[in-house]
Curated annotation (Swiss-Prot):
Zinc finger C4-type: from-to: 4-21
Function (record text): Plays a major role in decreasing resistance to glycopeptide antibiotics.
Organism: Staphylococcus aureus (strain N315)
Protein encoded by which gene: tcaA
Record's protein name: Membrane-associated protein TcaA
Pfam families: TcaA_2nd (PF22813), TcaA_3rd_4th (PF22820), TcaA_5th (PF22819)
GO cellular component: membrane raft; plasma membrane
Cytoplasmic side: 1-49
């Protein structure tokens, strides 16, 4: 179609004269227009044929670019570079992410310790060289799947292993730091609280029992911690150094603000050693001059006293208070008994005991003769006055006499004797009818006019 330049009427391309105004069209313009339209149509056909090829070429370029991008971030060499850069730049968070596994979460503080350990025990330059060589060998090998980087002393510090592929083309390398177990062995039941793997952790260790506190990657650690015992709460650190371990465990050194108490007693020579006690903060314990008591927190006062027995009576020292400001890691204290008071009491009791022993010697000398006479004559009346009527011992001896099973005794010796009210306990050494020496414990009752009678007996 074309338009009349004079009146604007639309007409077919092959019409020579406008049907409305009679204007005569130029035949050369129509021919030119027809030629131009044909050229455009031809060019359009050519363009449509080229588009698929252009799209295909563009996609190919994109694939090539994508491959190189993936290679830059996912090839074994790229994975190695990421770890190396993180260690070189002390990027503890990145190192923690790279080393963490499902079974062992590594936090940023552990990673920081690990980075320093690598730089100190391997050397950064050597570590980078060893790591690149190891990755290269694993990547080329058809059989090897894992290898270790080691410290100068031969400790395994990093495990490098193949772990499948990435995006079909690239071997996936895994970097894992070996772990060991730090162990504690407290003198008494202890609760430890600290942070591990980014989380708060609590470990309860029984007295004198080896207890692991977790799994840690190699490093030299000084972990802030709290510990609690029956003696109180302590703030400080758990310290352990993997350079000092050739096994799967490493000993923990405790560094807490604590005081240990050494006690010296004076004026205690007359006290029974087994009866001596020390009371610290209301907790009573057996005394030993070679023992160290504690530990106790250094931020709280400590009260301490001692006690002991002599001739059945308990004696105590004055209670002393050690101020927190005076507490040291090793603190010595002396506690004094009133030696004159103890000696006076012991002297008095010894006089009483000597008097009692003399009475008992006389009693058992008569009893042994009466016992033997009752045996020889089969007559309980010989011995009945020495035994309290109605007691189980009275009935037992009477039965033995009637059956002829009463034992002969001789040479009684008083080994020990104590009196409590009207009751007396005595340890007596005898020789039986077989000629054997035996120790027997007797209980007696002191009646009117200081008359003694046996109540019961047993062999010691």
């Amino acid at each position: 179609m074309k338009s009349c330049p004079k009146c604007g009427q639309q007409a077919q391309d092959d019409v020579q004269i406008c049907t409305q105004c009679g204007h005569k069209f130029d035949s050369r313009q129509a021919l030119y227009r027809k030629s131009t339209d044909e050229d455009i149509q031809t060019n359009n056909i050519k363009m449509r044929k080229m588009v698929p090829w252009a799209i295909g070429f563009f996609i190919l370029i994109l694939i090539i670019i994508l491959f190189f991008l993936l290679r830059n971030f996912n090839s074994p060499e790229a994975q190695t570079k990421i770890l190396v850069n993180a260690i070189e730049n002390n990027d503890k968070q990145k190192v923690a992410t790279l080393l963490s596994t499902k079974d062992n979460k590594v936090d940023s503080e552990e990673a920081k310790v690990y980075i320093n350990y690598i730089k100190d025990e391997v050397g950064l330059k050597q570590f980078v060289s060893d790591l690149k060589n190891t990755v290269h060998k694993l990547n080329k090998s058809k059989t090897s799947v894992a290898s270790y980087i080691q410290t100068r002393s031969g400790q395994n510090i990093l495990r490098v292993s193949k772990n499948g592929t990435r995006y079909i083309f690239f071997d996936n390398m895994s970097f894992t730091a070996p772990t060991k177990q730090p162990i504690v062995k407290p003198k008494e039941k202890t609760k430890y609280e600290f942070k591990s793997g980014g989380k708060k952790k609590m470990v309860i260790a029984e007295a004198n029992k080896v207890t692991p506190i977790g799994n840690f990657i190699l490093g030299t650690y000084r972990i802030p911690a709290m510990k609690s015992t029956e003696n109180g709460d302590f703030a400080g650190y758990l310290k352990f150094d993997f350079r000092q371990s050739n096994s799967e465990t490493v000993d923990v050194t405790e560094d807490f603000e604590e005081a240990n108490i050494t006690v010296t007693l004076k004026g205690d020579t007359k006290l029974n050693d087994s009866s001596k006690k020390v009371t610290i903060n209301d907790r009573e314990m057996a005394f030993s001059s070679s023992k160290t008591y504690g530990p106790y927190p250094q931020n709280k006062d400590i009260t301490i006293s001692a006690s002991g027995k002599a001739k059945g009576k308990t004696f105590t020292t004055q209670t002393k208070t050690i101020k927190a400001s005076d507490l040291k890691y090793n603190t010595e204290i002396t506690l004094n008994f009133d030696s004159e008071d103890i000696e006076d009491y012991v002297e008095k009791k010894e006089k009483e005991e000597n008097s009692l022993k003399n009475k008992l010697i006389e009693f058992f000398a008569g009893y042994s003769l009466a016992n033997n006479a009752a045996f020889n004559q089969s007559d309980f009346d010989f011995v009945s006055s020495y035994i309290k009527k109605g007691s189980s011992f009275y009935d037992d001896v009477k039965k033995r006499v009637s059956k002829g099973s009463l034992m002969m005794i001789s040479s009684p010796q008083i080994i020990d004797a104590e009196k409590h009210g009207d009751k007396i306990t005595a340890t007596v050494r005898l020789i039986n009818e077989n000629g054997k020496q035996v120790d027997k414990e007797y209980e007696l009752e002191q009646g009117s006019q200081d008359r003694l009678q046996l109540i019961k007996t047993s062999e010691k």
